[in-house]
């Protein structure tokens, strides 16, 4: 699964330059999680998970606190999750996950991006069946066999455990992501660089330089949209 790990790292690195955009997207996600339950992360597991992910992305504490305070203050915005699927050039596929307070705006924007950037938006399920929803946990380490034993003993449903560039990379069934994190914390592992649910392509394609330029423009435009939280694709050389 080295290629999958490389793609996850590349995606996270590519976003590091757009810090203000990352902060804003996490602010929305934290606010939405706090509004859907208690605004206290110790009483709201969804909120706690989002905050942990925000910290991994180096989102400042004041951004996190501001989003929670907004929820506590009775902010009246309601956010809805969505998923849009489509195609780029030469067998490339793309999934955009959204969190929006205005679904009509989001649908219009996503459709426009696909149309203007050389893609075609598809029906629900037209692409996602070629991706596996997967829990991904990453932390510093070099002994995947030992980690696998910890997870096996905790009855975590694990797809794979690998060592990549000095990191332990764990792929779990999506329902067991939090169980896996808890098992690792119980074993004394508390520092994670990634704890995410990812849509991982079952197979990948490589695009020509010309097609890659078109596809990269499509991905960048989707990621720049304020309502788009995550973008997944099956292009190996992006």
UniProtKB/Swiss-Prot annotation:
> What does the UniProt entry say about where the protein is found?
Cytoplasm
- Any Pfam family matching the protein: TACO1_YebC_N
Q: What is its main location?
A: cytoplasm
* Xref: PANTHER family: TRANSLATIONAL ACTIVATOR OF CYTOCHROME C OXIDASE 1
Q: Organism, per UniProt?
A: Shigella flexneri
Keyword list, A-Z = Cytoplasm, DNA-binding, Transcription, Transcription regulation
Tagged with keyword Lipid biosynthesis: no
| The name this protein goes by in its record | Probable transcriptional regulatory protein YeeN
Entry's Gene Ontology BP terms:
regulation of DNA-templated transcription
Q: Cellular component per GO?
A: cytosol
| Organism lineage string | Bacteria, Pseudomonadati, Pseudomonadota, Gammaproteobacteria, Enterobacterales
Please give one Gene Ontology molecular function term for this protein.
DNA binding
This protein's record includes keyword Transcription: yes
InterPro entries associated with the record: Integrase-like_N, TACO1_YebC-like_2nd/3rd_dom, TACO1_YebC_N, Transcrip_reg_TACO1-like, Transcrip_reg_TACO1-like_dom3, Transcrip_reg_TACO1_YeeN, YebC-like
- SUPFAM superfamilies per record: YebC-like
Which family would the database say this protein is a member of?
A: Belongs to the TACO1 family. YeeN subfamily.
Q: Which domain of life is it from?
A: Bacteria
């Amino acid at each position: 699964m080295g290629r999958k790990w490389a793609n996850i790292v590349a995606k996270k690195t590519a976003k590091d330059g757009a810090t203000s955009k990352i902060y804003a997207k996490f602010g929305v996600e934290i606010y939405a999680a706090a509004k859907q339950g208690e605004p206290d992360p110790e009483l709201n597991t969804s909120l706690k998970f989002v905050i942990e992910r925000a910290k991994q992305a180096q989102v400042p504490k004041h951004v996190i606190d501001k989003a929670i305070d907004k929820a506590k203050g009775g902010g009246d915005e309601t956010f809805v999750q969505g998923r849009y699927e489509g195609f780029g050039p030469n067998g490339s596929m793309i999934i955009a996950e959204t969190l929006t307070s205005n679904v009509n705006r989001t649908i219009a924007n996503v459709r426009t991006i696909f149309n203007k950037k050389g893609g075609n938006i598809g029906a629900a399920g037209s692409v996602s069946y070629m991706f596996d929803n997967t829990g991904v946990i990453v932390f510093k380490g070099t002994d995947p066999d030992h980690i696998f034993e910890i997870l096996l003993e905790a009855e975590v449903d694990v797809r794979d455990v690998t060592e990549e560039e000095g990191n332990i990379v764990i792929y779990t069934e999506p329902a067991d992501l939090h169980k896996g994190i808890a098992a690792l914390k119980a074993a004394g592992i508390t520092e994670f660089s990634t704890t995410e649910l990812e849509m991982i392509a079952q197979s990948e394609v490589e695009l020509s330089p010309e097609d890659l330029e078109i596809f990269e423009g499509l991905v960048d435009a989707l990621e720049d949209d304020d309502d788009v939280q995550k973008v997944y694709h099956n292009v190996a050389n992006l």
